[in-house]
A protein has these predicted regions:
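N-terminal type II signal-anchor transmembrane helix
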Residues: 1-46, 75
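Solvent-exposed beta-strand/coil patches in large extracellular/periplasmic or lumenal scaffold regions
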Residues: 51, 68, 118-172, 225-227, ...
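Flexible beta-edge/linker motif
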Residues: 54-143, 168-172
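Small-residue helix/turn framework positions
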Residues: 62, 67-69, 99-109, 134-139, ...
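Amphipathic hydrophobic-ligand
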Residues: 73-86, 114-116, 147-159, 175-184, ...
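N-linked glycosylation sequons
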Residues: 256, 281-283, 288, 356, ...
């Protein structure tokens, strides 16, 4: 009996140690790893293609994969330059614990659905299986759209946990051009997929104010209600805004603008805190906003605003920016680019105005111009050039060309030309508003 007990104990010990031995062998053998990868199915259900190229190393000691290509009925993924290491012991309790996971390039692109859509929510992993991804880093992640420019994120880091019906993303950080991003969220297996997330975006340059936006959401990818908005350098609170995160994506809603103070940008305090409401309509073809803003300093009622543009690779491109004041018939049309650089926003704008008068309201007109052209270019100190037909009070019409520099707290102009009657005047000078209003002008007049 004693001998049988010993034999039974040895057999039990061998049975219990067999998984550990097999796991140890798999974890430290490159040949075993390649064999397991070769046995993976290349197609399964909605997975149309799985391709894994050039696997080297071991699970426990660290391994590399040259490329993984995944083609799903809705999305295409290509992952290049993979490096990772697995902790072996957690595999015994059905946990895949990945550490030091790094990807050189990740590309995601939508694909037209070629299979019937699922009727029930599919789990992310088999029941009781857990995947832990620690110290995850993606050097470059590109999201391509069916239309429009791709979105490229750099140096993305995060911690993640995947279970049967939940994916947790913690402490995600990265950059979109010069915009720093932070996010936390939970993706939920549902029809459609559910998402609970918090995100923050920050742009800080050497010149100019800091830009900060925060957004929270809790919904599904068909309809994600958005709360939050822009916090600095002015406030733009989202109102009744929602995002469709599935292709074709779109964002609809409104932004309630307040505390827009030009002194934050080096401008004059004359305009006061500008406020108003803009209707938002964003999608892959562009970003559109329409509404009205009001300046207490102008005291002229609302000014209609219309914007249509795109954003890609650090550059906001204004196809058109229109400002209109119905009572005075003033209209300003602008187009060009704003590029977010380390030194500050770089402007390259041009436009025209019609029916400008000052003041905007009232019977007495000190200055008026039926039409004119302008350009605004530079970083920090912005070069301005205007060409216009100008009338001051009751004086005859004059032709003007003004070249100047808009700097924090002042406007400096040099050799600006005024053609009046049969003579020409050349003026240089400075108009300042910080800390106090000041001005000086020098010039000469010639026949």
């Amino acid at each position: 009996v004693k001998r049988l007990s010993i034999i039974a104990g040895l057999i039990l010990l061998l049975l219990l140690s067999a998984p550990v031995i097999a796991l140890f062998t798999l974890g430290h053998s490159e040949a075993a790893l390649r064999y397991v990868v070769a046995q993976l199915p290349t197609k399964a259900g909605s997975l149309e293609k799985l391709q894994i190229d050039n696997v080297r190393g071991t699970l426990a000691g660290g391994f590399t994969v040259e490329r993984i290509v995944i083609e799903h009925d809705l999305v295409y993924l290509r992952i290049d330059g993979i490096r990772a290491r697995l902790e072996l012991l957690p595999l015994l309790w059905q946990t895949i614990d990945v550490s030091d996971f790094e990807v050189r390039d990740l590309e995601i692109a939508p694909q037209p659905r070629n299979q019937p859509p699922p009727t029930i929510a599919r789990p992310f992993l088999p029941r009781l299986l857990t995947l832990e991804a620690r110290q995850t880093r993606v050097r470059s992640a590109t999201i391509r759209q069916s239309t429009g420019s791709p979105v490229i994120f750099k140096e993305v880091t995060a911690h993640g946990t995947i279970r049967e019906r939940r994916i947790w993303i913690r402490d995600a950080k990265g950059s979109l051009g010069n915009i720093a991003l932070e996010a936390n969220g939970i993706l939920k297996a549902a029809m459609p997929l559910g998402l609970e997330a918090q995100a923050k975006a920050t742009f800080a340059s050497r010149r100019g104010p800091r830009w900060v936006a925060r957004v929270n959401t809790d919904g599904d990818l068909e309809n994600l209600p958005l709360e939050g908005g822009l916090l600095e350098p002015f406030v733009a609170d989202l109102d009744a805004a929602s995002l469709r995160a599935l292709p074709p994506w779109n964002l609809r809603g409104a932004a309630k603008v307040s505390k827009l103070d030009f002194t934050r940008f080096g401008g004059s305090a004359f305009f006061g805190d500008i406020a108003g409401t803009l209707a938002l309509d964003f999608d892959s073809t562009g970003y559109r906003a329409i509404g009205a803003l009001e300046s207490p300093g102008l005291d002229a009622g609302p000014i209609d605003v219309e914007f249509d543009g795109t954003f890609a690779r650090n550059t906001l491109r204004a196809r058109t920016l229109k400002l209109a004041h119905a009572p005075s018939r003033l209209r300003i049309d602008t187009s060009g680019t704003v590029t977010f650089e380390d030194a500050g926003p770089a402007l390259a704008l041009s436009g025209r105005w019609q029916n400008f008068r000052w003041p905007l309201l009232g019977d007495d007109t000190a200055l008026q111009s039926e039409r004119g052209l302008f350009t605004l270019e530079g970083v920090g100190n912005y070069d301005i050039r205007t060409e216009a037909a100008l009338r001051i009070g009751t004086l005859p019409l004059m032709r003007t060309v003004i070249d100047g520099s808009l700097q924090p707290g002042r406007f400096v102009f040099t050799d600006s030309r005024f053609d009046f009657l049969k003579g020409t005047s050349l003026f240089s000078g400075e108009l300042g508003w910080r800390p106090d209003l000041s001005w000086k002008i020098t010039g000469r007049i010639k026949d």
